[in-house]
Structures are given as C-alpha cells and as structure tokens.
Amino acid sequence: MEKQRLKAQLSSLRVPLFSVPWPEQCSNKAEVVEARMMKWADEHNLLVTDEYRNRVIRTRYGLLAARCYPNAGDELLQVIADYLVWFFLIDDLFVDCVEVATDETIRNLTAMVDVLDLNVSGSPPVFGELAWLDVCQRLRRLLQVEAFERFAQGMRLWATTAALQILNHLRPTSVSIREYQTIRRHTSGMNPCTSLADAANKGSVQACEFYNADVQTLVRQTNNIVCWANDIQSLRIEIHQPGQFRNMVTIYAQQGQSLQDAVETAATRVNKEIASFCELANAFTARDISHELHGFIDGLKYWIRGYLDWVVHDTLRYADQFIESDADDRRFSAPDLSLLNNSCSSVTESTRSLV
C-alpha cells in the first residue's frame, strides 16, 4: 500500500540539480581504470549474467572513482575503482534489491566482516568474498595501518547497520528522520570512501587531525550531501525495489507531504548542508593546517562534486528506462557458488602475490 501510493506520484516528479562552487575534476586515467575494473570483476566472477554485465558497463563505476579521486596514484585509483564496483554489486545483491531478509543475509554480511577482522576468506567463500579479500589486501599494502583501519571500521559499520536498515523495513511504517539519518550515514558506504580521501591526494593525515571535531563535521557533511542527494536521485528506482525502498524522501512523504514536496524538503536540506560545508571548509583551511590535511579536505570536495557530476554526466544507474530491469535483483540473489569455486584457486594465488 505504501509503495503503491508513492508509485502513483512518480510520473510527474521533478528532480532538482545540485551545484557546488568548485570545479569539476577527473583523472586522465578514467577509461583505462574502467576497462581494468571490468576485467577484475570478470576474474572474480562478480558479473553473474550478461544482463548484469551490461548493467555494470552502463553504470560506469570507474568514472566515479576517477571523478572522486582525481589525484590518486595509478595503483590506488585502480583498487578504489575495483572496490566501488564490488561494493555497489554486493550492496544490491545482499541488501537493497532483494527480499528484505533472506536465509543468507547473516552469512553474507558476517563473511564481509570476517575478511576485515581475520584477513582470510571462509571455506567455502560466499559470493564476492574473494574479491573483497583481494581489495582489502591491496589496500593494506598501499595504506598506513591506521588509515586502513579507518576504512575497515567504516565497512564494519556498513555491514552491521544493514541489520538496522532491515529492521526498519520489517516495520509497517518507517522510523523517524533522525533515526533514518543515523542508519543512512553508515549503510551508504560513504565513510570508507571518505577515509581514502587523504591517501588519494597529499598523503595520510595523522589521527589527531582526522578525528579533530571540525574535520569530522566536514566528513559528516560530505556524507550527508551525497546520501541525501542520492535519496532524491535514486527515488524512482528505489520505490520499485522489492526490499529496501525507504529513504529520506519517502519518510517525509509518510509524514503527510506529497512526493514532490518531500523531494523539495530533502533538496532544501542538501543545499543547506552544502552551504554549511563551504563555510566550515573555508574557515578551517584558512588556519595553519598541514599539507596532508589540506589534501584531505580537497578530497572531500572532490567526492561531493565527483558524485554529482557522475550522476548527471556518466551513469545510467538511476535512468528511467532501466528501472524495471534494474530494481529487482531477486533472480540474481543466489549466484551459483560453483562459479566461484571453479576459479577459487587461481584467484587465491593472485591474491597471495599481493600480500
């Protein structure tokens, strides 16, 4: 009933554009990174059918990496692109585009946490686990220990707050905006992404800099801007998902607003958050701060602008013409693990060479 009421308002929906006062950036390695990312996804059996492969091709995750990390070294940029294609596919297949909860949900998510905690895969591995181990081992080699742990903690919170998101969708009505924002802040996967912003620019910041209160406010604002804008931009496809479909816009609609008014309310919040980010970033960078911290704050800006440009110029992830085919992944939700097992030994050998 809730979904049907929302779907009835989609045909006339107007989605706003967002802008920020700093220029577009993109690595000149974007196309190479995209091609290598597709090859890597193939080698790790992430592209479960030709239909799914075509979806990934038109989504352009390598371009997202190139826009959000324009100054990253070649090796780091590639592992980030590989991480992004892995994350979007796993998030869709484990959480968003399948039933709210399945028999495999707990096993799948705990396997991802175990890779972070134990630095090994299970036997047998779940879908995507060997690819995830490969990403983590490459990042461990490229990042300082504490910097990797920031990334890892963000991913642990993604896996664990997914359970809160599932609980919210098992309720007859959604939790409030405040509770939703807490869940969204971590299920988005933005914290692992922003944790790489320093290494991808001018080098790792010290822990005392990263955890500075103003810096953490900038990180949260970056997270909010991307997540809340995405709640608007992905609204049409998310409403058609069989499992997770509630977001900031639908919660405002649940409170009595029309869907268009709910979009405008969310958009106003995005624009206010952009203004607050700009004010704090300008004030903070006017201080005597380290070269690396300047690079980190630049990296947050790259993520905001890079994501917004990716949605407008590159990706078809949220395109209307693919809603019917892309919103429901239940037919892909239990990929044949024999695909993984057939290549398990070769992938494991290539992974070991990275340690």
UniProtKB/Swiss-Prot annotation:
Residues annotated as binding Mg(2+) 3: N230, S234, E238
Binding-site positions, substrate: R184
Span(s) of short sequence motif DDXXXD motif: 91-96
Keyword Metal-binding: yes
Residues at which Mg(2+) 1 binds: D91, D96
GO terms assigned for molecular function: metal ion binding; terpene synthase activity
Keywords, alphabetical: Lyase, Magnesium, Metal-binding
Binding site residues for Mg(2+) 2: D96
Positions bearing the site annotation: Plays a critical role for substrate recognition: D92
Cofactor(s) the protein needs: Mg(2+)
Domain notes: The Asp-Asp-Xaa-Xaa-Xaa-Asp (DDXXXD) motif is important for the catalytic activity, presumably through binding to Mg(2+).
Entry's family note: Belongs to the terpene synthase family.
Protein name (Swiss-Prot/TrEMBL): Sesquiterpene synthase MAN_10655
Organism of provenance: Metarhizium anisopliae (strain ARSEF 549)
Classification lineage: Eukaryota, Fungi, Dikarya, Ascomycota, Pezizomycotina
